[in-house]
């Protein structure tokens, strides 16, 4: 979880669902990242034996720990790939100043690029697409997805901006409720979420082969 401005952990799950809260900042503050340091600071999700997370804690920010460099970010990602079969980095949209997100985008085997159907997303893409088209970001490995599509929104308009779109993720009221309740990792059980679940399963097959 790369976001150091708005740490995602508080809206992903309840504190009681985490075995022990540890901080990403403790890893990146080290002069060199080691496998043992990563394992020591992983947070295990009690409701899924196959999921562990690394991220900033509630109340922490970019100034809580000493600044880190590209080397620490690269070491973290390389070692994480040796520890776990799949490593997902939740990148921020501010790749110009977020070192971890920038390194993750460059080193990733596959990048899933999400865009909404609103004017803010269009403004962001107009500003940032020239940066993302640079050869160092390897546009060929970027899968494009239009996300949180509501009935009144035209995803086809976003395709005109993005080019070919691999996935179209519909809005789910159940997911929105989980976000508001801080339970985004919870199971989805409502009928209205079926289309959402199918698209997530499609992404899982395409990216991870599972």
Please place each PLM-identified region on the residue numbering.
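Conserved beta-strand segments of the P-loop GTPase G domain that flank and frequently precede/overlap
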Residues: 55-56, 88-90, 111-117, 143-148
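P-loop/Walker A phosphate-binding loop and immediately adjacent motor/lid segment at beta-alpha junctions
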Residues: 67-73, 126-152, 187-190
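Beta-strand-loop-alpha "switch" segments that mediate conformational coupling across diverse proteins
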Residues: 146-190
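NTP-binding/hydrolysis catalytic cores, primarily Walker-type P-loop NTPases
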Residues: 181-210
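Phosphate-binding loop that captures ATP/GTP phosphates
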Residues: 1-52
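Well-ordered beta-strand positions
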Residues: 86, 110, 164-167
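Inter-motif core of Ras-like GTPase G domains
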Residues: 98-118
């Amino acid at each position: 979880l790369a976001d150091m401005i708005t740490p995602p952990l508080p809206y992903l799950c309840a504190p009681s669902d985490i075995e022990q809260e540890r901080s990403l900042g403790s890893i990146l503050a080290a002069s060199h990242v080691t496998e043992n340091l990563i394992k020591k600071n992983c947070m295990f999700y009690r409701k899924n034996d196959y999921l562990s997370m690394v991220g900033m804690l509630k109340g922490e920010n970019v100034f809580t720990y000493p600044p880190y460099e590209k080397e620490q970010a690269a070491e973290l990602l390389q070692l994480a790939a040796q520890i776990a079969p799949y490593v997902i980095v939740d990148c921020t949209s501010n790749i110009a100043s977020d070192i971890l997100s920038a390194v993750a985008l460059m080193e990733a085997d596959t990048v899933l690029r999400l865009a909404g159907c609103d004017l803010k997303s269009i403004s962001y893409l107009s500003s940032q697409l020239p940066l993302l088209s640079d050869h160092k970001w390897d546009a060929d490995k970027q899968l494009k997805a239009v996300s949180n599509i509501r009935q009144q929104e035209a995803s086809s308009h976003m395709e005109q901006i993005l080019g070919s779109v691999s996935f179209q993720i519909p809005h789910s009221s159940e997911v929105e409720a989980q976000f508001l309740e801080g339970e985004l990792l919870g199971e989805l059980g409502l009928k209205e979420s079926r289309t959402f679940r199918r698209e997530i399963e499609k992404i899982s097959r395409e990216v991870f082969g599972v």
